[in-house]
Amino acid sequence: MPGLSDPVAFIKDFAAGGISAAISKTAVAPIERVKLLLQVQHISKQIAEADRYKGMVDCFVRIPREQGFSAFWRGNLANVIRYFPTQALNFAFKDKYKQVFLGGVDKNTQFTRYFIGNLASGGMAGATSLCFVYPLDFARTRLAADVGKGAEAREFKGLGDCISKIFKTDGLVGLYRGFGVSVQGIIIYRAAYFGFYDTARGMLPNPKTTPWYVSWAIAQCVTTVAGIVSYPFDTVRRRMMMQSGRAKSEIVYKGTLHCWATIAKQEGTGAFFKGAFSNVLRGTGGAFVLVLYDEIKKVL
């Protein structure tokens, strides 16, 4: 584990996390866009009720037919730009927080403290990085939710256009809409994502010699469980993001709590999990990130 005074080790952590994240996110971009559309279509001004996607398969079929095959990667560049610092900071700060929460803790004799320390370090790492990259996360969501068929029908021309338009209409608040519930969700997700993964690997006889497929299986289980548990928070935050830039008369949700209540009342609790199966499939990429990160660190 790199020390706090070891900048080389910190940079290696940053590079390994960022590179592995960029590769995996590009690979699963089509799945992520489908997931986002299923989550926010009920609040989208571009998708009429009669034109809403019926499910994951319907969405996969209609996107290339209506928007072109390359539309599967709409917003992917913004996602890579966002995800590189997000994941890199998550991994880098995770080890820093582990030194704070796990310093001097023996995993064999202090398992409870070891487990809680891993949960805390993972959650704090996710929350810290989110503070820095939230506007990029916001823009990625809005670009992916843009279903305009041509340049003129698109709501935003690109990442810069999205950020500038929202900033002009709503200011910085618009770019950080949904931040509160995002922090709640990210702490829950990252706590499980890093906490359970590191705890499981820590219980192995020799993590450094563990076969890659064992690490992948552990990571797959972790990302699936973490994704499902935190999914409702993700749905609410993305619904809130969709309201930025709108006129007051077009605002549907008065706040985060009102959003939770409105979705549950009008659409049912199942609405919080729309696109969740796509998220499970996307989790394969998340599991790949964890394994690839460990492998890249061995090379660096």
Swiss-Prot record:
Solcar repeats lie at residues 8-100, 113-203, 214-299. GO terms for molecular function: ATP:ADP antiporter activity. Keywords: Antiport, Membrane, Mitochondrion, Mitochondrion inner membrane, Repeat, Transmembrane, Transmembrane helix, Transport. Disulfide bonds: none annotated. InterPro entries: ADT_euk_type, Mit_carrier, Mitochondrial_sb/sol_carrier, Mt_carrier_dom_sf. It is found in: Mitochondrion inner membrane. A motif (Nucleotide carrier signature motif) lies at residues 237-242. Residues 237-242 are annotated as: Important for transport activity. The chain crosses the membrane at residues 10-39, 77-101, 112-132, 181-201, 213-233, 276-293. The matrix-open state (m-state) is inhibited by the membrane-permeable bongkrekic acid (BKA). The cytoplasmic-open state (c-state) is inhibited by the membrane-impermeable toxic inhibitor carboxyatractyloside (CATR). It catalyses: ADP(in) + ATP(out) = ADP(out) + ATP(in). ADP binds at residues 82, 94, 237. It is a multi-pass membrane protein. One of its GO terms (cellular component) is mitochondrial inner membrane. ADP:ATP antiporter that mediates import of ADP into the mitochondrial matrix for ATP synthesis, and export of ATP out to fuel the cell. Cycles between the cytoplasmic-open state (c-state) and the matrix-open state (m-state): operates by the alternating access mechanism with a single substrate-binding site intermittently exposed to either the cytosolic (c-state) or matrix (m-state) side of the inner mitochondrial membrane. Monomer. PANTHER family: ADP,ATP CARRIER PROTEIN 1-RELATED-RELATED, ADP_ATP TRANSLOCASE. The transmembrane helices are not perpendicular to the plane of the membrane, but cross the membrane at an angle. Odd-numbered transmembrane helices exhibit a sharp kink, due to the presence of a conserved proline residue. Belongs to the mitochondrial carrier (TC 2.A.29) family. This is ADP,ATP carrier protein 2. The lineage of its organism: Eukaryota, Metazoa, Ecdysozoa, Arthropoda, Hexapoda.
